[in-house]
From Swiss-Prot:
Biological source species: Listeria welshimeri serovar 6b (strain ATCC 35897 / DSM 20650 / CCUG 15529 / CIP 8149 / NCTC 11857 / SLCC 5334 / V8)
Single annotated GO MF: glutaminyl-tRNA synthase (glutamine-hydrolyzing) activity
Function: Allows the formation of correctly charged Gln-tRNA(Gln) through the transamidation of misacylated Glu-tRNA(Gln) in organisms which lack glutaminyl-tRNA synthetase. The reaction takes place in the presence of glutamine and ATP through an activated gamma-phospho-Glu-tRNA(Gln).
Gene: gatA
Subunit structure: Heterotrimer of A, B and C subunits.
Entry annotated with the keyword ATP-binding: yes
Alphabetical list of InterPro entries matching this protein: Amidase, Amidase_CS, Amidase_dom, AS_sf, GatA
Enzyme's top EC category: ligase
Name the UniProt record assigns to this protein: Glutamyl-tRNA(Gln) amidotransferase subunit A
Annotated HAMAP family: GatA
Cellular component terms per the entry's GO annotation: glutamyl-tRNA(Gln) amidotransferase complex
């Protein structure tokens, strides 16, 4: 049994009693990385020397009994800036970018005395569902190395599933925490929009992006979200909501819980094995005293189209800052200012990023704004209202995190429409801004299936309670890939 088979609480107790040290945990992390990283490719940049230095300092000072995360190793998605540690967003254009400040979530993790093991691979600028668009390398699913780990936070999910770190941070714009968590058999939470500061998150689509935790179990996830939540003056979209003790609400009691199951989420396009795992999960929740009814989210069918217009439009604006002038890659082949812009961006961005910039610029252009961007915003309002209507009668909404299990590497990368449609069950949640968690709920042909539990605004505590109650009745979260 490895050290990372223990929970956050168990490791904290061992650290306080000095049965183990932070140095032991960092050693465990880098030993595992040395053993499996060549197979899975979770990391872009390792933080080895600094991690051991911090571990020694914490060991010498002793672990604060009230600081649950102190001394524990974490991995950070590489679109979250870390002072003096290369942050690339998995793009050539930021290949050598060395930030001069920490993201707010990184500062909070430092205050919590976690130990940053390194920066995790992702789809370039978080644009993708498979971690295949990274400039550096593809990440492989620990459960089947011929398959993708999901995306865009594929490195964050694979590192946890492979035991390279205890937990990690990802970001979720249209499913980028929940889908990889489902594909890799781990727990991933997309918080309510505004619950966690975006300051220091390299922007993709500012009205959709949200940072969240990926862990091996629900309780660990709750501890990590407690540490990174809260109002931040540096983020105008951050909301002044009290930081709850999510971990205190894991009682297992969900008697009387009312569950809505959208017919759109278990219909055409959902793999039979995925559907069966979700139906089995609903039976487990029924045994615990919950009830469920079929409901409708009628505008979900417009989710993918609306999302890719809105997200691409915001990306075309956000990514205009990468021009070769202030920081990042600068083309050596440019002789005029216009050439500098064109060549830097043409050479620095990958194909998927360029595709989305062009799509977004087109949607925002004067002749097409009303036909595309405005209509997408109107559809977003209808999608949001669907959730409001269901939450008037039901406590949570449940369905699959993804219509399929992990697909083959190179299986969809040249078919953007099929790749985009894989997000059909996750993008409506981002468009509405509500929270959702993915928890392991079974296997289909040996590959993990994720159960998506969706809540009303700022009801993460209820999501954790339901997810934890389900987890305690099953053993799926204890299953490990054979690497």
């Amino acid at each position: 049994m490895g050290l990372f088979d223990f929970s956050v609480k168990e490791l904290h107790d061992k650290l306080v009693k000095k049965e183990i040290t932070p140095f032991d945990l960092v050693t465990e992390s880098f030993n595992r990385i040395e053993s499996v990283e060549d197979k899975v490719g979770s990391f872009i940049t390792l933080n080895k020397e600094a991690a051991f230095d911090v571990a020694e300092e914490l060991g010498d000072a002793g672990i604060d009994p009230n600081n649950m995360l102190a001394g524990l190793p974490i991995g950070i998605k590489d679109n979250i800036v870390t002072k003096n540690l290369r942050t690339t967003a998995a793009s050539k254009i930021l290949e050598n970018f060395d930030p001069i400040y920490d993201a707010t979530v990184v500062s909070k993790l430092k205050n919590a005395q976690t130990i940053n093991i390194g920066k995790l691979n992702m789809d370039e600028f978080a644009m993708g569902s498979s971690t295949e668009t990274s400039y550096f390398h593809k990440t492989h699913n620990p459960w089947d190395l011929s398959r993708v780990p999901g995306g865009s936070s594929g490195g964050s999910a694979s590192a946890v599933a492979a035991g390279e770190v205890l937990f990690s941070l990802g970001s979720d714009t249209g499913g980028s925490i929940r889908q990889p968590a489902a594909f890799c058999g781990v727990v991933g939470m997309k918080p309510t929009y505004g619950r966690v500061s975006r300051f220091g998150l390299i922007a993709f689509a500012s009205s959709l992006d949200q940072i969240g935790p990926i862990t091996k179990n629900v309780e660990d996830n709750a501890y990590l979200l407690e540490a990174i939540s809260g109002l931040d003056a540096n983020d105008s979209t951050s909301i002044n909501q009290p930081v709850e003790r999510f971990s205190d609400n894991l009682t297992g009691d969900i008697k009387g819980l009312r569950i809505g199951v959208p017919k759109e989420y278990l219909g055409e396009g959902v793999d039979p094995g995925v559907k069966q795992a979700v139906l089995d999960a609903l039976k487990t929740l029924e045994k615990l005293g919950a009830t469920w009814d079929e409901v409708s989210l009628p505008h979900s069918e417009y989710g993918v189209a609306s999302y890719y217009i809105l997200a691409s439009s915001e990306a075309s604006s956000n990514l205009s800052r990468f021009d070769g002038v202030r920081y990042g890659y600068r083309s050596p082949n440019a002789h005029t200012l216009e050439e500098l812009y064109k060549k830097t961006r043409s050479e620095g961005f990958g194909d998927e990023v360029k595709r989305r910039i062009m799509l977004g610029t087109y949607a925002l252009s004067s002749g097409y704004y009303d036909a595309y961007y405005k209509k997408a915003q109107q559809a977003r309002t209808l999608i949001k209202q669907d959730f409001v209507n269901v939450f008037e009668k039901y406590d949570v909404i449940i369905g699959p995190s993804s219509p399929t299990t992990a697909f083959k590497i190179d299986g969809m990368i040249n078919d953007p429409i099929t790749m985009y449609s894989n997000d059909i069950l996750t993008v409506p949640i981002n468009l509405a801004g509500v929270p959702a968690i993915s928890v392991p709920c079974g296997f289909s042909e040996g590959l993990p299936v994720g159960l998506q539990i969706i809540g009303n605004y700022f009801e993460e505590s209820l999501l954790y309670k339901v997810a934890h109650a389900f987890e305690q009745e099953t053993t799926f979260h204890k299953e490990k890939p054979n690497l």
